[in-house]
Amino acid sequence: MTNPNPNKQTVELNRTSLYWGLLLIFVLAVLFSSYIFN
């Protein structure tokens, strides 16, 4: 299977990891704030 545009796959991977990073930061912020205000 040949991929004529490997750059597009790299961009998609970076975008996906960026979304996962933001989601992780959001979850950690919620847990941290609930731990502080409890």
Curated annotation (Swiss-Prot):
Pfam families: PsbL. Keywords: Chloroplast, Membrane, Photosynthesis, Photosystem II, Plastid, Reaction center, Thylakoid, Transmembrane, Transmembrane helix. The chain crosses the membrane at residues 17-37. One of the components of the core complex of photosystem II (PSII). PSII is a light-driven water:plastoquinone oxidoreductase that uses light energy to abstract electrons from H(2)O, generating O(2) and a proton gradient subsequently used for ATP formation. It consists of a core antenna complex that captures photons, and an electron transfer chain that converts photonic excitation into a charge separation. This subunit is found at the monomer-monomer interface and is required for correct PSII assembly and/or dimerization. GO terms for biological process: photosynthesis. It is a single-pass membrane protein. It comes from the Eukaryota. One of its GO terms (cellular component) is chloroplast thylakoid membrane. This is Photosystem II reaction center protein L. InterPro entries: PSII_PsbL (IPR003372), PSII_PsbL_sf (IPR037266). The lineage of its organism: Eukaryota, Viridiplantae, Chlorophyta, Mamiellophyceae, Mamiellales. It is found in: Plastid, Chloroplast thylakoid membrane. The keyword Flavoprotein does not apply. HAMAP family: PSII_PsbL. It comes from Ostreococcus tauri. PSII is composed of 1 copy each of membrane proteins PsbA, PsbB, PsbC, PsbD, PsbE, PsbF, PsbH, PsbI, PsbJ, PsbK, PsbL, PsbM, PsbT, PsbX, PsbY, PsbZ, Psb30/Ycf12, at least 3 peripheral proteins of the oxygen-evolving complex and a large number of cofactors. It forms dimeric complexes. Belongs to the PsbL family.
